[in-house]
């Protein structure tokens, strides 16, 4: 029986309040309105962004909410005016929209669509939610809310992909892989023969390693306090790995000693201000580039000596790896299907949605790179 135009009852993982575990609940998902798409979510990754939400009571979020932004699924129905996808299409959800009309979308170097700011309201464009549970409205998250069997997303936050793409794999292209890989390829523009250092070897950092290797870097140094991640990092392209806790000197001094002149391209893939300062200080004084990939706390001010920039170092931000979301994501999926990209090593665990709190523990203890949740 068709569900088009009907309210759908399904399972979702809800955060009822800050610091609480996920609660599996039955929710009601309303039909899509104009320019909206309702999607049957098939697979979604548990990203570091969600881990930061779970680990902080200070983020400016509204509760209760349905998290999740690294998703892939199948279009169930579409609202009035939707023209780029149809029911049955396989799609990837996009936390970063591409409206195609704002100055960032129209600039060849920009990808931070102005419509992203709509996500800060945690509601749809009309100021309402499409989710209810126990008679209570549930807030959206990151334009996507993929920790729900069905979700409603604006058309500009949906990318149609290859009809035979394995959704349990390519969901990583929705955030983690694209963010890290693109930070090396697009933002830093890593050059052949260069030296790179990646601070943080989780899902995003591991993807940075892959991007550095693809760009032709000859020396890729992974930095992490969890030695268990070193084997995987080397498999992905890291030539050396360091644990700062094992060193007798600060990591930036060690990296200078190892390279004589500092690192060409450094990447901070954790979201830690102290690590960012160390990464910047590790860069070659004259032309080194440090790229901020990790999600830094908005409430904390960055304090770095201006002397670090005097000689020529540069610090760059990167969102979604510099990709224009709707334009580039289908191409990345096509590259995966053509075996030009390999996402499989990043996926260390696969669990059902009702095991989401187990996935959280795996992430907290550093036992997984990426856990995929099946819905």
From Swiss-Prot:
Q: Which UniProt keywords apply?
A: Cytoplasm, Metal-binding, NAD, Oxidoreductase, Phosphoprotein, Zinc
Q: Name one GO molecular function term.
A: zinc ion binding
Chain positions with Phosphoserine modification: 23
- What are the subcellular locations of this protein? Cytoplasm
Protein name from the UniProt record: Alcohol dehydrogenase 6
Similarity section: Belongs to the zinc-containing alcohol dehydrogenase family. Class-V subfamily.
Cytoplasm in keyword set: yes
Q: What's the catalysed reaction?
A: a primary alcohol + NAD(+) = an aldehyde + NADH + H(+); a secondary alcohol + NAD(+) = a ketone + NADH + H(+)
One Pfam match = ADH_N
Residues annotated as binding Zn(2+) 1 are: 47, 69, 175
Gene3D superfamilies documented for this protein: Medium-chain alcohol dehydrogenases, catalytic domain, NAD(P)-binding Rossmann-like Domain
Q: Which cofactor does it need?
A: Zn(2+)
Q: Which SMART domains match?
A: PKS_ER
SUPFAM superfamilies registered for this protein in UniProt: GroES-like, NAD(P)-binding Rossmann-fold domains
Instruction: Note how many cofactor molecules are bound and how.
Output: Binds 2 Zn(2+) ions per subunit.
Q: What does the subunit section of this Swiss-Prot or TrEMBL entry state?
A: Dimer.
Q: Which GO terms describe its cellular component?
A: cytosol
EC code = 1.1.1.1
């Amino acid at each position: 029986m068709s569900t088009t135009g009907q309210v759908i009852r399904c399972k979702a993982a809800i955060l009822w309040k800050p610091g609480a575990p996920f609660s599996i609940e039955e929710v009601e998902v309303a039909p899509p309105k104009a320019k909206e798409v309702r999607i049957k979510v098939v697979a979604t990754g548990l990203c570091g962004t969600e881990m930061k939400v779970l680990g902080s009571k200070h983020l400016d979020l509204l509760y209760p909410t349905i998290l999740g932004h690294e998703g892939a699924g199948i279009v169930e129905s579409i609202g009035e005016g939707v023209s780029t996808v149809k029911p049955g299409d396989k799609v990837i959800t996009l936390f970063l929209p591409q409206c195609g009309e704002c100055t960032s979308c129209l600039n060849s170097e920009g990808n931070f669509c102005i419509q992203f700011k709509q996500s800060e309201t945690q509601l749809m464009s009309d100021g309402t939610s499409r989710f209810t549970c126990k008679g209570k409205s549930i807030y959206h998250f990151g334009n996507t809310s993929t920790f729900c069997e069905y979700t409603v997303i604006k058309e500009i936050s949906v990318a149609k992909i290859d009809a035979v793409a394995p959704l349990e794999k390519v969901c990583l292209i929705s955030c983690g892989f694209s963010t890290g890989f693109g930070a090396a390829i697009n933002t830093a523009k890593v050059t052949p023969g260069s030296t790179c250092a990646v601070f943080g070897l989780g899902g995003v950092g591991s993807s940075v390693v892959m991007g550095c290797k693809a760009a032709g870097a000859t020396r890729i140094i992974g930095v992490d306090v969890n030695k268990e991640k070193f084997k995987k990092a080397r498999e992905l392209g890291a030539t050396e790995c360091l644990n700062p806790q094992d060193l007798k000197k600060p990591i930036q001094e060690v990296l200078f000693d190892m390279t004589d002149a500092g690192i060409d391209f450094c990447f901070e893939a954790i979201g830690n201000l102290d690590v960012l300062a160390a990464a910047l200080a590790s860069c070659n004084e004259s032309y080194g580039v440090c790229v901020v990939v990790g999600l830094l706390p908005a409430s904390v001010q960055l304090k770095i000596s201006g002397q670090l920039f005097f000689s020529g170092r540069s610090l760059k931000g990167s969102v979604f790896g510099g990709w224009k979301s709707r334009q580039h994501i289908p191409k990345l999926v096509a590259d995966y299907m053509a075996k030009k990209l390999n996402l499989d090593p990043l996926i260390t665990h696969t669990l059902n949605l009702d095991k989401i709190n187990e996935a959280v523990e795996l992430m907290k203890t550093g036992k997984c790179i990426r856990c995929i949740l099946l819905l």
